[in-house]
Amino acid sequence: MFEAFIYNISVIVAGIYLFHRLQYSENKRMVFSKAYVTVLMTIVSLLLSVYPIPYREDYLIHLTFVPLLFLGRFTNMVYTLSATVIVAIVEIVVFNNSIMYGVTLIVIAAVTSAIGPFLKQNDVLSLLILNVVTIIILFGVALVSPIYTLSEVIILIPISLIITLASAITFVDIWHFFSLVNRYENEDKYDYLTGLGNVKEFDRHLNEISRKAEKEHQSIALLLIDIDGFKDVNDTYSHKSGDAVLKQMSQLLKNYVPNQFKIFRNGGEEFSVVIHNYSLDQSVKLAENIRSGVEKSSFHLPNKEVIKLSVSIGVGYLTDDDPKSQRKVFKDADDMVHVAKNQGRNKVMFNPIINL
């Protein structure tokens, strides 16, 4: 029994590590993949089917449902049920388990995937809650079906809780570790909070676009976007609320800025967009769309409060005939941001000084 217990824990932990390792090697940027976690946890569940934990001569403790709890938490019902159907078929056809056992697995998958993604607790506690839900389902099955007895389900409780807890802690710990590695390797280019390019990458990119525009006789424009009254958000609510606002602002900018242009967080509450081969009119219209979009949007804070914000935007612009000076286009945009602030905020300003 002890050997089987160790095997079950080892298989789950190894599967969790393999998921993170393959994910990191494949993407380098640790983008969470539901497909990856589904494939890996399905394989882990099948491996657990091979070596159930023996308890007495006539009873085996099956822990194939434990990896399915991870699917219920981290994916959705489609992924979870798809994996569970595969596991159930293998259990019935290959390992001669009853059809009722397969149906029980599917019921567990349906229930846990219906509630798992919506649990507000941290991941470890959420997985333990899903384990308790599973035990309740198994108690119900024991009352109506002979595949379990109440005493067998009771024996399952401590074993499943220990394995679920160990697996959950391992999953979260390895995820945090690889996330820190990814952050360290990319901190020279990316802002860790928003995922946008940072100020170093902004300087490199603006310099590169300036050289390209000079060579190909293209125009360049720079939008500097500053959140109005952002300090008040931090002071009134919390820095955590400020971080939430910055994340939502970065997503809003992605929704408005065309894919061919790059967005950066320059630091604090300032963002920038580098534009090339656009007319001044097109650049100003893009800035106005962003300003208007922010004004109409609601920003949700961690304490459930909703606030309204505005931005001041300065536009720096060099025509296709102008010498392409990185310093000049930045200074023009920066000057216009200050003009927008001084004239009441929530404005788009460009040179010559005209506000929209």
Swiss-Prot record:
Q: Transmembrane stretches, by residue range?
A: 2-22, 35-55, 74-94, 99-119, 124-144, 154-174
Query: What molecular functions are annotated in GO for this chain?
Result: diguanylate cyclase activity; phosphorelay sensor kinase activity
Topology within the bilayer: Multi-pass membrane protein
Reading the lineage from the top rank, the first entry is: Bacteria
A Pfam match = GGDEF
User: Which residues does the UniProt record annotate as the domain GGDEF?
Assistant: 218-353
List the GO biological process terms: cell adhesion involved in single-species biofilm formation; cell wall organization; negative regulation of bacterial-type flagellum-dependent cell motility
Instruction: Tell me which UniProt keywords the record has, alphabetically.
Output: Cell membrane, Membrane, Transmembrane, Transmembrane helix
**CDD domains (alphabetical):** GGDEF
Q: Where is the signal peptide?
A: none
Q: What is its main location?
A: membrane
Question: Would you name any one GO CC term?
Answer: plasma membrane
Q: Where in the cell is it found?
A: Cell membrane
The name this protein carries in UniProt is Uncharacterized membrane protein SAOUHSC_00760
